[in-house]
A protein has these predicted regions:
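ATP-dependent carboxylate/acyl-activation modules
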Residues: 1-161
């Protein structure tokens, strides 16, 4: 993987380097196809978002500091579902990273009502598909002022459906 490529020429050079490295590693591997994606701008913060079935308590939403901070800060809150947008909003405000979302040191603020609404929609999707999806974890969820982007996600489905 290569990051920070800013021109067509730098992308072409990266493709050559990676293709050559793959061919040296294993000549039998197909090294003719590449996935090239736009690099995302740095977010205001990163969240971990998890919705899973608990055998004892039912469906639960866990929110916390995401990305590399997930284990470092041990900053999580769990809500039993169903939870309202207001409850999700209140839970977000209890996180250590809430100050970042509130414009810490003059930085851009996150639209917390919009973020809460988006997270609520995720919980609604999960609650309406419990027989198909057992667990969803997004880490990190990039949080910008007016939008979010799931950078990496893991979905456990029910193999029987």
């Amino acid at each position: 993987m290569q990051l920070g490529l800013t021109s067509e020429q730098s992308v072409a050079e990266a493709v050559k380097q990676i293709s050559s490295a793959v061919a040296r590693f294993n000549p039998q591997l197909d090294h003719s196809q590449f996935l090239i994606e736009r690099q995302l701008a740095s977010p205001i913060t990163e969240l971990i978002v998890s919705v899973r079935q608990d055998s004892q308590f039912g469906m639960a939403l866990t929110l916390g500091s995401g990305g590399i901070l997930a284990e470092l800060l041990e900053d999580v809150v769990t809500l039993l579902l169903p939870a309202s947008t207001a409850e999700i909003h209140a839970a977000l405000k209890t996180l250590k990273i809430a100050a970042l979302m509130d414009g810490y040191r003059g930085q851009t603020k996150v639209d917390l009502p919009a973020l809460s609404s988006s997270l609520y929609n995720i919980t609604q999707f999960m609650q309406h598909n419990p027989e198909k999806i057992m667990e969803l974890e997004i880490n990190p969820l990039f949080v910008y002022q007016q939008q979010i982007c799931a950078v990496d996600a893991l979905v456990y489905t029910n193999a029987e459906t």
